[in-house]
Amino acid sequence: MLPLKDAIAEKHSLAEKMTFNQRMFNGELSDEEYTLYLCQQLAIFDAIEIHELPHPALDRAGKVFEDIKELTGGGQIQITPLVATNEYRKYLNTLTKEEQLPHVYLNYLAIMFGGQMMKSKVPGSGKMYEFDGDMNQIIGSIRAIQKDEWADEANKALDYNINILDELQRLSESTSGETAVDGGEIA
């Protein structure tokens, strides 16, 4: 059996090369486009965070919501996830805490590592990328439970994330950045 990192390398590379992801990394997203991305992240984190995380500092939903409020000027915010995000969220809601751990590994470590570079490239202050506490302990909380057997499920998580990035890019191209943020709750 391949180590987890090697087993997901191909799809991880594909996700990194998605047009929307590249535009985000290059600092090319408008406030509206990034806000729409954050809305998708909030829906995903809300679904994952119904279960206890390996470390309390991993909680992202609150930080993402702060970023959304900052970029939209606060007030009442209605968040409508994209079709691809709803599919992922529905899938996550079928999983037990143990079954969700590969999704924690993928979604949270991505923000902890790649997000540190991304923070300076995105609109707003990037609270989603800020973790309170010792980063080594926080990362260690995931690494301590990490299993190579997670490869299939982590690849499935990458498939969902690739679909979300693809839908974000298609929406971006068709609407020139109008968002599905009405103004929070997730619909």
Tell me the role of every PLM-derived stretch.
Residues M1-A187:
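Metal- and O2-centered redox machinery and metal/ROS homeostasis
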